């Protein structure tokens, strides 16, 4: 099973690269343009999709102007089953998304593999209404196999500006065994992480080729990193308060 999982993941990554390259490049272009124009990258996901928002936040080798939207009841640590129920509630997103600082110069990623639940859809609609360029990372196969739970009947891929298909199968799990009654071994986190990091890597090069110094975090475990990172945090702390919440930067 170990070999099979690695093989499946490698095949899956190649599938995404071959089918989504144009969309990946478009996303990278929009990220690059947003940062050059004073915007930031914002991300939102529920449940395990939320993991991806943390993967690219405050990340060694990653972009600095990245703001995850943390809504703890929609994560897993305050009750996993409850978080799934909340994600299915129409209009719940209005309790938090309207208070977020989302601007027309921003790019906003919404992460949901099934793409059917109301909260991610409402978040995408709100970000779009505020003028941000919206990008979904979702599975078209999965989405089209299940009815929407949103009151409009729409799915996530139908309400955003750009769709990056992660090509995950319905139910996310890719392995089977005669003695196991349900599919197992999910893929969406591995694939989603690769998609985001690839998009950001391309955006970094686009900025550099345009003569702009890309805002990149250096690993905090490398000597001199604190000084390097401090100036970037100072630049973006107003737009991304979670960078410094609970910590007073030394002058």
From Swiss-Prot:
InterPro entries: RpiR-like_SIS, SIS_dom, SIS_dom_sf, SIS_GmhA/DiaA_subfam, UPF0309. One of its GO terms (molecular function) is carbohydrate derivative binding. CDD domains: SIS_RpiR. Residues 31-214 form the SIS domain. Coiled coil: none annotated. One of its GO terms (biological process) is carbohydrate derivative metabolic process. It holds the Pfam family SIS_2. It comes from the Bacteria. Belongs to the UPF0309 family. This is UPF0309 protein GK1441. It comes from Geobacillus kaustophilus (strain HTA426). The lineage of its organism: Bacteria, Bacillati, Bacillota, Bacilli, Bacillales.
């Amino acid at each position: 099973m170990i070999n099979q999982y690695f093989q499946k993941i490698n095949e899956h990554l190649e599938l995404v690269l071959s089918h989504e390259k144009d969309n990946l490049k478009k996303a990278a272009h929009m990220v690059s343009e947003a940062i050059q124009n004073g915007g930031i990258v914002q991300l939102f996901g529920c449940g395990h999709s939320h993991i991806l928002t943390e993967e690219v936040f405050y990340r060694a080798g990653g972009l600095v102007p990245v703001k995850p939207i943390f809504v703890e009841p929609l994560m897993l640590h305050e009750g996993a089953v409850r978080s799934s129920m909340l994600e299915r509630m129409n209009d719940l997103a209005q309790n938090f998304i309207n208070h977020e600082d989302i601007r027309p110069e921003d790019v906003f990623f919404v992460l949901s593999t099934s793409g059917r639940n109301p909260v991610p859809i409402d978040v995408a609609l709100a970000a779009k209404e505020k003028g941000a360029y919206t990008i979904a990372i979702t599975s078209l196969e999965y989405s089209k196999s299940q009815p929407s739970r949103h009151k409009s009947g729409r799915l996530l891929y139908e309400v955003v500006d750009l769709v990056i298909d992660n090509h995950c199968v319905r139910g996310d799990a890719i392995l089977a065994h005669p003695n196991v009654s349900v599919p197992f071994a999910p893929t969406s986190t591995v694939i989603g992480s690769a998609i985001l990091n690839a998009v950001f890597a391309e955006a970094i090069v686009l900025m550099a080729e345009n003569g702009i110094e890309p805002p990149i975090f250096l690993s905090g475990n490398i000597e001199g990193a604190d000084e390097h990172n401090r100036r970037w945090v100072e630049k973006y702390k107003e737009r991304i308060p979670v960078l410094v919440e609970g910590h007073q930067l030394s002058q």
